[in-house]
Amino acid sequence: RRGNDARSRMARKSAEVEYDGSKYARRDVIGDMEIVNSFGRQTLIDFYHKWYRPDLQAVIVVGDVDVDAMERKIRDVMSSIPKAENPARKEVYDIPQRDKPRYGLVTDPETKAVAVKLIFYQPYPSEEERATVGAVRDELARKVFLEMARARLAEAEKRPDARYKRVVAVLGSLATCRNTFMLTALPKEHDMREALAGVLTDVEQIRRYGFSREEFEAARAKVARSEKAALEKYRLATNTDLAGRYVEHFTRNVPYVTPDDRTRIVGEQLDALTCEEVNGLRAGMTSPEGMLVLVSSSEEHLDKVPSEAEAFDLIDSVKRAKIARPERRGKSAGPLFTEKVTPGKVVRTRKAPLGAEEWTLSNGVKVFWRTVPEVIGVRKVGVTAVSEGGFARDSDVEGMHLLQNYIRTMGVKDLDRA
């Protein structure tokens, strides 16, 4: 809670590197900690009058209220606050765009975290750009690019010669300074040099050759499913959700869009995206120029951390290396069942506890079906299969749990988890 554990200390050290060159690199969430830890009464009063002023405030009311009466109350209370004289300008700070890669190492005596991150910086849309349909299209294109990269890296993990255990790819942003594309490689045997070499090579392959149309279509379909689920949640907004959207509009100029308009805009822009357009993002999403290599390590494994010089040498060698084109997948996965399935019948139905129904099938399987009240923003069907009987040794239990995770990760038959 005091932010003095290993994770918090590592996060602060990482932020100093990620935001380097910006005022944010010297500030915590609530400001310059030297001032926070030592300010006097007058400093606090001056800060209040400098920033807590009418032109930087908004009152947002959401609920079943008398609109006219509520507006009168707000005007009565707020209109007496005087306008600030010679108001301070609200500055927007940036992170400088570099033309060379950067390196950072963060560690802590108590941390167990061992990882290698590649962070690629892209421009953050301006206030004017955020209010356009183009901003929606750009964000959708980034999401499709992300899904293609995730699928490609997931395939790379499975290779016998993979040089890392796993790579996690995410999109993000640093305040309103920069958008980011971040890859976190988890090393084998704490070997961060090998992990860095491996992820650099896989990213360079993407940068050189891009993605195929088949990869694009699969990723776009996945983004479409994700957006559909998000739109259903958007449509089921609570008052708190609505208030949050209006706050985003006021503080970040993110326009509030009705559910119908949002559904239409997302659908139109996603349908209009092309493989060539998304492949065109490679320059900003995978270029080593301006890339940050950020290594997190426990102190006991510092001998396996690449130095700054070693990291830059690896970047240069990968840029010059011969890298084969990615292997294209063969035919798409076929149906789950290749033989005709003979349907059974429900031979008995009865009421079960907790409002459920019990169906006995002709093959003896019992199905318990229960409909639960809808939770706002959550629409899903949960299925659990249980087979009773038989014997298992204690030593088998661990393997059974491992098998569950294996199936969940690898998929079924020719169908992967995507």
Q: What role is predicted for each listed range?
A:
Residues 119, 146-186, 245:
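A structural supersecondary motif
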Residues 271-304:
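Extended, domain-scale alpha-helical bundle/helix-rich regions
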Residues 156, 173-232, 254-255, 268-272, ...:
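M16/insulysin-pitrilysin zinc metalloprotease superfamily fold
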Residues 1, 29-37, 56-64, 130-138, ...:
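Second-shell loop/turn segments in exported
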Residues 1, 66, 85-99, 162-171, ...:
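Acidic/histidine-enriched alpha-helical segments
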